[in-house]
Amino acid sequence: LMDVPFYLAQPEYAGVTDIQVAAATRKSDEQIVAIAPQAQAVVNKAVRLAKLQSTPNADKQVAVMFWNYPPGEKNLSASFLNVPRSLRHVLDGMQAAGYDTTTPQEDALIEQLQHLLAPAYRAGRLQPLLQANLAELLPLADYRAWLTQLPEATQAALNAAWGDPAQSRMVVRRGGQDFFVIPRLQLGKVLILPQPPRSDGQVSKEKAIYHSTTALPSHYYFATYLWTRQRADALIHFGTHGTQEWLPGKERGLSVYDPPLLALGDIPVAYPYIADNIGEATQAKRRGRATIISHQTPPFAPGGLHAALTHMHDLLHQWLAQDEGAVKERTAIDLLAAAQKERVVADLGLTVPQVQADFAGFVRQLHDHLHELAQTAQPQGLHTFGQAPEELHRLGTVLLMLGQPFWDAAAIHAGVPPEDADEALVGPWEQLAQTAPYQLLQRHVVQGEPVDDLPEALQKSLQQARTAYANLGAQGELTGLLAVLDGKYLPTSYGGDPIKNPDAYPTGRNLYGFDPSRVPTQQAWEAGKQAAENLIAEHIQLHGKAPEKLTFSLWSVETMRHFGLLEAQALWLLGVEPVWDAGGRVTGVRLVPREQLGRPRVDVVLSATGLYRDHFPNVMKQLAQAALLASQARDEADNPVARNAQRIAQQLIAQGADPEVAAQAGATRIFASASGNYGTGLDDAVLASDTWSGKEEGDRKLAQLYLSKMQYAYGPDEKQWGQAGVAGLEGRQGVNLYAEHLKGTQGAVLSRSSNLYGMLTTDDPFQYLGGIALAVRHLDGKAPALYISNLRGAGSGRVEGAAQFLAKELATRQFHPGYIQGLMQEGYAGTLQVLD
């Protein structure tokens, strides 16, 4: 577990792909010996890569697998990628590189790919696909022959879950033989097919949602991949992201008989992946044998203000400029009415009486709020793989990369008084191209005017802008994909949010993750300490006293962006600090004395995603040790960590637990899903309202589902990691230790460090932050306060209420005409983005 930095992170940094366990040390004589099936898998992959290198492009067969997401019989998409247009661009590029393929028109391509999805939703659609040459047959005998080569335990598990393969609804009978039907669109030697659903529709919804812990994919899932391996020389998993790398099995160092590798076999996998999701891209590397080809996020622009907010901003400035009197009073009435109409008063967490009691204070808050909305990075539509954004959006992205110092300097250079420079981008969203910062970029970046006569700071910014603008060209994406299809090495790069980390571009490179041994970095530690104090202050302001217990949701994708700032918050709340070696690697933690801390410790429960568990076991070890140290500081009268640890230990001893086991359980603070499993189960369960009757039963079943899925403990003793319950208290009276530790949670914290992914972009914030809130309400009868550690901008990060954060997201996206029009221009793919 602790060797992830050495065996995985460092080789991935160098560009090594498909790292497999091929040998082991024999206990009897300490000799390194090959593990035959594993070593064979490495050899087979090397042979297939060599074949890609030697086969002319015109002779290569390539399969492209797309995702049926969001669920629905007409839906195909990927995260912030226009899939139909991207497929067409890739097909054009493959043709130009000598591949035997054609490129249908966009509407025809969408219609044909939608036909391929129909059998997953409706009976009687297999024969029409076969008649239209939109499917092929895989003899069931071929699948059985493959199945019989697997270990007996694997065969038994598959048959126990799904019965005999012949029972699959994707099987047809012809000429006395059974065949799996594989929907596919054949364009020359390129095959495009949907990734098969994990389920075959034979398991009851109640069992699948509430009781399944392993969720083995169906016979049909494996059959589709078997057919793909037989037909194709390489496989493209198209966009972020599919299901194969999330199948059950070990976190890393998988066996070839674990479901993720069982599906893939040894076929080379190219995986175009969004640059701002390094964590899940790493999952595709380690569990999907993939070479990642990074692609851009959508371009961005400062959101600006829509008409109602522009009017509000104008009223605000009128009020500030007016002398006391009737006109100013009338303006104040109009401004408050406008703010109420747009629900901005509520968004600021205020009431009308509070506004009236301190109108000048309200104006200051409103002014800051409108500036933040106008300057917020707003995604502009979707990205098309291999295509550069249009000039307006490209320059808008560069503007955001350069940030407030450039905006102010550009405005002052254009003659704006310094006291008004911060208004440079605060105006109607349609007029971005008329602003001074944008026009300066256009002249010196696009038109190439010299910068020699400009102030030195502007010269430096514009040189950076020229590089950033060039890097937004996206030329490397198609080049990178074609290189992988040639079996070639692909240069590496770090990814992340391009606004915060412009070095994530140019794209078309093989993404690697952050070295987990450096979490938190010393910079993240200093920022995290301040963020922790900000969190305490925010809670005091809202609730009148400091929190005693908080629960944090830890995400791999977030940690790879903020380098451990959220972990630093948790450590400082506990009153523990990291110890680094000379190279910046964390080697341990130590307790901060109470007098040095200057306040009581805060008890912290840590709920980790499955991906975090996989990628950061060494960080979990340090966090577990930190919780233990804080729980052992029993001489502090105001230490809730020690108090809660002792309370839980005593409860467990009273129920019959061994005192040492009880003490370990009391000191445990980290929980996640079972090893090899991912998610909370809430994403599917909330849509299955037909499995409960009434809100009370629904809340109870959802909370119990969440607690059962996320109860696996990662405490001070690594040997006991990943276990549910408490040793000695198994059976009917088994203890859910996670539930015991969640009781009394006063606040739950999630970080947001991406300018692209917000609270509503995916269901993950709902699953994890919402799951904590749901569980605590179930346990305590009262939901905790929900906080967002907003790490999008520079500095230590702000702590905001989730409601306020969500309100700003709605104002700059779902309720903003610029965002809506951007998606409308994407056609079919934009509609799916709204649906998602």
Pin down the residues of each PLM region:
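Ligand/cofactor-recognition surfaces for anionic moieties
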Residues: L1-D836
